[in-house]
């Protein structure tokens, strides 16, 4: 293969590889925060048949805000999520293994929209801020240890 072809073909393969792993299966605006790890998203330009979805962040667990396990830490986690996500646009990497959890919520890793492209991993941000713990639920495609080191 001539060097000029290699120079053209190599970047093309790199772009394809990057696109395959891009966390932009869905994009939308967060319309409601339920608790630290659950919120509603109004989708834009998605391949999903739903316009408004409820999202449960993959492989993390925030303290509870309701019921017998409700605590101040749960309220703090909810406030953190609300301050970062409410009325903002995010990108979602949706679970390709099962899609939804037992409560009909889409399981996803969320990324902040930074300049119109996927930016910081919000699941990781919650853990790093001390508002969530990693829980590697094996019924989804994600490996939290790959993004939380």
Label each region the model flagged.
Residues 5-11, 15-149:
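Small beta-barrel nucleic-acid-binding modules, primarily SNase/OB-fold domains
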Residues 1-2:
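N-terminal secretory signal peptides that target proteins for export/translocation
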């Amino acid at each position: 293969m001539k060097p000029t072809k290699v120079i053209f073909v190599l970047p093309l393969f790199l772009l394809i590889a990057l696109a395959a792993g891009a966390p932009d299966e869905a994009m939308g605006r967060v319309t409601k925060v339920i608790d630290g790890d659950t919120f509603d998203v109004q989708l834009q330009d998605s391949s999903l048949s739903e316009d408004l979805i409820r999202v449960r962040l993959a492989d993390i667990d925030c303290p509870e805000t309701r019921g017998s396990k409700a605590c101040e830490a749960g309220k703090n986690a909810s406030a953190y999520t609300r301050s970062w996500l409410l009325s903002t646009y995010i990108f979602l990497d949706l679970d390709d293994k099962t899609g939804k959890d037992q409560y009909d919520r889409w399981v996803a890793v969320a990324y902040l929209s930074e300049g119109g492209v996927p930016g910081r991993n919000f699941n990781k941000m919650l853990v790093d801020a001390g508002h969530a713990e990693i829980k590697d639920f094996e019924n989804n495609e994600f490996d939290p240890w790959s993004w939380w080191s």
